[in-house]
Amino acid sequence: MLLSARSTITSTWWLLGLQILVLLHVNPQSQMLYTLLLLLLLMATLNIIGYFHVPRTMARQESNTWLSQKVGLFKNISVKLWIFLRYLIHFGAVYYALVCPKPPPSATEEQIRIFKEFTAPSVLRKRASIKGKTIREAQKTFRITHVDQFVEAGTYLRVHVHPKRFPRCYEIDWKSRIIAVSESYVVLDKPAGTSVGGTTDNIEESCATFATRALGLTTPLKTTHQIDNCTEGCVVLARTKEYCSVFHGKIREKKVKKLYIALAAAPVPIGIIAHYMRPINMAPRLISEDFIKGWNLCQLEVLECKEVPWPNAVIEKKYCVEDCGWPSQHIAYECKINLLTGRTHQIRAQLAACSAPLVGDSMYMPAAIAEMRSPGLNPFGKYKQNYTSETDEAMAVTEWIEQHGKEPNVVIGLQACQISWDDGEHMYEAGSPWWRCEIA
């Protein structure tokens, strides 16, 4: 069994996974999943405790004596780890594949050697579980859903030991967020600080899960489209696989219209705003004023823009709005936006490029402030410089990315205020955005 994470896996976790792989090789009988994971995490805990708490001046015998005195501690740890592992599986944070995918660039020569040993054709031919499958099919990962699942030697496991959490899910009155319920779908007024359908490592704390429970449904609701975790507003959840496919088709055919209300830190011009977004699925999303071959067109239409008071300190505290250092926090600008293309972070990135970042947007506002203070810092902006070499340009891009901050923890000034499809035959609106909230 080989433990891995995504492409950013550390060599430490690969090494721990390889230790279990060797253990299974010595005793290649099928093992219950949670037993192996418990052993894996216990090994990690022992290594950590031994490394940080055993004095380095101890002789081997003294160290063994010290460890024997900590038996009670380790037993307590093992129980807690067992409970922790059950939670990880419940959260959907554990995956498996019959054959391990290619190791990451950080893998050592020894780790690569062991990987090759357990994925050699002569070894794979002996495994009954992958007969009739191509290597690519056998390397496909699946989420573990039961703690009593059995695995065999050579199985790949990916364990996300630090799932992204969404504590706000437990603070929401979910029934009050339901906008509409039909036989085919549910429309939800999604709270900010929550995930629509969950993340790679957490499908438990999601809008789909909590809305399903609030309505007492026996079949889980399904995600049809996404909005950012820090965005609130209208989301359509399908009640059946069939309608999920139907709604996806409507999105592809551009039959779904979305209106947003954005709270910007500066005024935004009325009309259509166009940029080009770098086709890399990684935040922050970089956009260019000018056309760049291969970059994706981003268009939105600002329908109106009006002055409103900047959210007061009480509202900011209630909704955990982050202070991103905007110089003047008295007047904000509420904009109604028709989203013409649906790119990830599109409104956030485009308005920041217009020197009007969203209130509370800790990712894009710092970069917008940096560009305002040092025009030309943005290598794709209005005041971009001419670079003499590709190396200089690459360094400028790296420096520009570093000007961006982290993803907001809870909320930004953005609401998906209306969603409609089939030429307005189905139209739904969210409640008042958080910044209009009256504090009792």
Q: Model-predicted segments: where are they?
A:
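Short, low-complexity, Lys/Arg-enriched N-terminal segments of secretory-pathway carbohydrate enzymes
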Residues: 2-9, 13-16, 20-22
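Pseudouridine synthases involved in rRNA/tRNA modification
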Residues: 12, 17, 25, 33, ...
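Hydrophobic alpha-helical transmembrane segments
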Residues: 22-28
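Short, aromatic-rich membrane-interface segments at the entry and exit
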Residues: 30-36
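RNA pseudouridine synthases
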Residues: 50, 146-156, 161-210, 215, ...
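Contiguous, often N-terminal, cationic amphipathic patches that form binding interfaces
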Residues: 92, 133-136, 141, 262
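A short, conserved structural fragment
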Residues: 94-96
